Amino acid sequence: MKFNQYLWSLYKNSSEGKSAIAAFSDRKEWMTEERLFEKYNPKIKDSFNSEMICGILEDFWCYKVSEHEGTELQSLEEAGKLYEEIISTGLMIESEEVLKIGDFDRMLELIPFLSMELNYLFGEYFFPYIYIDEFCQLTRLADYFEIELPTIPKKSDYKARCMYYWELCKVFYKFRTGNGLSPDEFSAFMYDYAPNLLTKEDNTDMPKPSSAWFIGGLIRYGGRTTGFWQSNKETKKGDILIHYETSPVSAITCLWIAQVDGVIDPFFHYYSNTYIGDKIDIPHISLKELKSDEYFSDHPLVRKNFQGVNGWPATGKDYAELMRIIEAKGFDTSKLPQIYTPSLPEGITVENERDVEVNLLEPLLNSMGWYEHKDYVRQLPIHAGRGHRIFPDYALHYDNKPEEEKAKVLIEAKYHMKNNQKIEAAFLQAFSYAKLLLSSVIVLCDKECILVYEKNQGFSRDRYTKYYWEDMKDSDLYNELKNRLSI
């Protein structure tokens, strides 16, 4: 969805809008900035208390940012050079080296606080980054307003991950100036206006678990039932998370369900995470029990005393053996989630992308009463710039009038989207086509499954409904999918 000047004007001139904008413009002390962090991201309290936040903000202002008070930045290039200099030269407080020169690993967790001070002095070029452990919310905002985010650097490149904040600054500078927002208005837009537009994720259609993963750590905060947790980047929404609580508990104590696909967060030290929910308490399985168990005594994770547990993949055999132990403790394992193994419909073979189209997708569309050149077309040529054309795989419910091509449903077929990176790349490709065709639904499919993304005011890479090909034997699921595509 494009930025709507009319809706923004209504917000900007409302009492709520004026208050939010003023909160970012009237920052006279660090406690005021601390309150902004706490208001717009309460999870910050999981890692930092108020005194710590104010102390870090004060240190960055007094010993890094304020020395540039007389500087007038004339361009993005100058601002980028200043930022790189600041993050590369460490932090000395009087005679104490608080942050070593070139310690980009440590700098990662401090970027949000530095960003607040840079925004205070050079608001034209820097925005306050408050998405601590909430990077998925930033991607949702970007998807909703059709903003293309920069490619996230590799996990091991800590400097590039620190510089990613500057890459975001450049993207949002273009968005802000293009839509006529002041720096303080943009901050209010990002943290107060936009979140009210983004629909809350509906997890009633949770996909079947495709995998299981081990995670670990003590469950604090009164035994919470949902939250942010380090995980494997290949975690998928609906997957099973087997929780090993570390010392002094030293036992597997519960299962969780991943609420979102694995999120790569460049500013999170461990890089990948998910949100956990739907907690299921199980009889405790102690480390001592596992070490004496015939199967788990030789398991590499058990032999390592669960060192490096977060994101460790659990095989189907691992999970089955856990079920055996839990059942032996008198627990009804039929109540526990099971890993789902997809299979192709009987008699179907798929060896490449074209097989997905011919043997799976087209028969499904035909069964729903939609046929090529009547209801859908393959490789619809779309004008995308002067002398350039692109060809989406399938356009369903289409209008191929030259220069005005449209399709209500955009379908991209792949052979195998084997990981989250492949799925995201396919989504972004389809998203770019959908914007040109004014599509309301995006469908991604491969040899295993069908992913349906509905616009609902704005697409989101994290909001989809998942079907397996064999689900189409179920009349309820078949008709549900048909209804989603019958727009």
Name what the model sees in each region:
Residues 110-113:
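Small-residue hinge/turn detector
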Residues 1-38, 306, 316-374, 378:
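Charged, often low-complexity linker/regulatory segments
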Residues 1-108, 123-206:
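An N-terminal alpha-helical hairpin/helix-loop-helix interaction module that forms a charged
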